[in-house]
């Protein structure tokens, strides 16, 4: 990719991104902030061409800090390879080739920059970065893009397996994980696949297990969260790592940057006509879409409830909606292929967020003080949903885990109308205040970001 001209360099940081899901974007957000704070340090950002193309626009060079250089690495897919359709196949191919691909591109970047890399800042998934850092005499800074609960589940995988037993797990799914301080309300069935159930021998499961074993070797581990959200887990994790830093919510830290709000479908203008706390915002992220029957149930529940709504739904899924739904609800709500989520969750009219409970979405909802209705699918989403409902008490999981017309209607009524919903809103507002306090100039997340800057470039 085209690279900005370089000022004089004092140090060189290699940033290694995981190019799947929503991992690369928050790592780039952190990289931009660090680069702006340390203009004499070069940050070489390594990612696949496909992922980079979605992160950087053609005119991005003008806005990108001059000390960020962008490199494309191979995706690990052999020439002429035919995908079999196996789940996580692309991830497996990438991971198998990643260590050598990263080494090769880092060497190229060192030649171009004229400065050896002295810090590897990577997605925490890259357990092999521990050995890479040792090889080149560099520090390793790892970024966990999800929450403290899921990080703890992977850090303590061996302990959980020893306590629960992988063979007996089917009989113990409802038990809570009391053996880990801060996870006493988390059930076995809430843990991500690959901890004690699912395919423990998959490439992805083994990667997460190796990650949990390797992370204590890192110079520092940082996370997109804030300390008051999980204080007990924060203290626990701080005792396990050389340095553990909550630097989020990143969405609030980056809000100081002047960014033009993209709203091509007029969602925010539509919201201006709605009363405070009345609108249901519905989005399940960029990776998953509920199955057809659940999409129909959501539509039927919305129509029957009369609740105003903004629904972010891929165009290819519109055919799954009940016939005539869009026409009948034209005055009630809007269905759009993309919505400005952060701005919608900050809007006074938003009363509930119907979500898959991906970590970025949860944190954005917390930052907006908006209660949630959760429909988790995989990974850390069940953990996040459990925390939303039982730990923080700022929402609820959909009844019986899947959308039905009646179940969804009851959830909307509970959150938007009933006293339970008022309590959720109150709790969400308190967490919002703590989130903003954390990123204030003297807040803990701001202080931790300065600590991260120190760990990465040693300029303080």
UniProtKB/Swiss-Prot annotation:
Coiled coil: none annotated. GO terms for molecular function: anthocyanidin 3-O-glucosyltransferase activity; flavonol 3-O-glucosyltransferase activity; quercetin 3-O-glucosyltransferase activity; UDP-glucosyltransferase activity. Keywords: Glycosyltransferase, Phenylpropanoid metabolism, Transferase. Its EC number is 2.4.1.91. Pfam families: UDPGT. GO terms for biological process: phenylpropanoid metabolic process. An anthocyanidin binds at residues 23, 88, 154, 379. This is Flavonol 3-O-glucosyltransferase. PROSITE patterns: UDPGT (PS00375). Disruption phenotype: Dwarf phenotype and altered flavonol glycoside pattern. The accumulation of kaempferol 3-O-rhamnoside-7-O-rhamnoside in the mutant inhibits basipetal auxin transport in the shoot, which correlates with the dwarf phenotype. Flavonol 3-O-glucosyltransferase that catalyzes the transfer of glucose from UDP-glucose to the 3-OH position of quercetin and kaempferol. Possesses high quercetin 3-O-glucosyltransferase activity in vitro. Catalyzes the glycosylation of anthocyanins from UDP-glucose. Also active in vitro on benzoates and benzoate derivatives. The keyword Acyltransferase does not apply. Induction: By PAP1. It catalyses: a flavonol + UDP-alpha-D-glucose = a flavonol 3-O-beta-D-glucoside + UDP + H(+); quercetin + UDP-alpha-D-glucose = quercetin 3-O-beta-D-glucoside + UDP + H(+). InterPro entries: UDP_glucos_trans, UDP_glycos_trans_CS. It comes from the Eukaryota. The active site is at residues 23, 123. Pathway: Flavonoid metabolism. It is an enzyme of class 2 (transferase). Belongs to the UDP-glycosyltransferase family. UDP-alpha-D-glucose binds at residues 145, 339, 341, 356, 359-361, 364, 380-381. The gene is UGT78D2.
């Amino acid at each position: 990719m085209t690279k900005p001209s370089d000022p004089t360099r004092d140090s060189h940081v290699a940033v290694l991104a995981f190019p799947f899901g929503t991992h690369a974007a928050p790592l780039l957000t952190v990289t931009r902030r660090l680069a702006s704070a340390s203009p004499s340090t070069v940050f070489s950002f390594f990612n696949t061409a496909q992922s980079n193309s979605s992160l950087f626009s053609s005119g991005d060079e003008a806005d990108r800090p001059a000390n960020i250089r962008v490199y494309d690495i191979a995706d690990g897919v052999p020439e002429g390879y035919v995908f079999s359709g196996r789940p996580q196949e692309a991830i497996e191919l990438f991971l198998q080739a990643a260590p050598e691909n990263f080494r090769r591109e880092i060497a190229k970047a060192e030649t171009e920059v004229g400065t050896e890399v002295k810090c590897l800042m990577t997605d925490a998934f890259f357990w092999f970065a521990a050995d890479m850092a040792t090889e080149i005499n560099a520090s390793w800074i790892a970024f966990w893009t999800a929450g403290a609960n899921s990080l703890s589940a992977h850090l303590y995988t061996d302990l959980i397996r020893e306590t629960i037993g992988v063979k007996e797990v089917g009989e113990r799914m409802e038990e809570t994980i009391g053996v880990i301080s801060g996870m006493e309300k988390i059930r076995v069935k809430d843990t991500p696949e690959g901890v004690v159930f699912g395919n423990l021998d998959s490439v992805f499961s083994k990667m997460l297990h190796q990650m949990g074993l390797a992370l204590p070797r890192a110079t520092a581990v940082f996370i997109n969260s804030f300390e008051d959200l999980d204080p007990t887990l924060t203290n626990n994790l701080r005792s396990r790592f050389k340095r553990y830093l909550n630097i989020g919510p990143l969405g609030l830290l980056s809000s100081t940057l002047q960014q033009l709000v993209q709203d091509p479908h007029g969602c925010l203008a539509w919201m201006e006509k709605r009363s405070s706390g009345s609108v249901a915002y519905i989005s399940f992220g960029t990776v998953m879409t509920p199955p057809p029957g659940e999409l129909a149930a959501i539509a039927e529940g919305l129509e029957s409830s009369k609740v105003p709504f903004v629904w972010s739904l891929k165009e290819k899924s519109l055919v799954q909606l009940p016939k005539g739904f869009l026409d009948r609800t034209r005055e009630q709500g809007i269905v759009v292929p993309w919505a400005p989520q952060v701005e919608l969750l900050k809007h006074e009219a938003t009363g509930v967020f119907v979500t898959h409970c991906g970590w970025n979405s949860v944190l954005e909802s917390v930052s907006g003080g908006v209660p949630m209705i959760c429909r988790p699918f995989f990974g850390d989403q069940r953990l996040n949903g459990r925390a939303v409902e039982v730990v923080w008490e700022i929402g609820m999981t959909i009844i019986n885990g899947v959308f039905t017309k009646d179940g969804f209607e009851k959830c909307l009524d509970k959150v938007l109308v009933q006293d339970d919903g008022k309590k959720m809103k109150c709790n969400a507002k308190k967490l919002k205040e703590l989130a903003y306090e954390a990123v204030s100039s003297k807040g803990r997340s701001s202080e931790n970001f300065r600590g991260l800057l120190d760990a990465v470039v040693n300029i303080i």
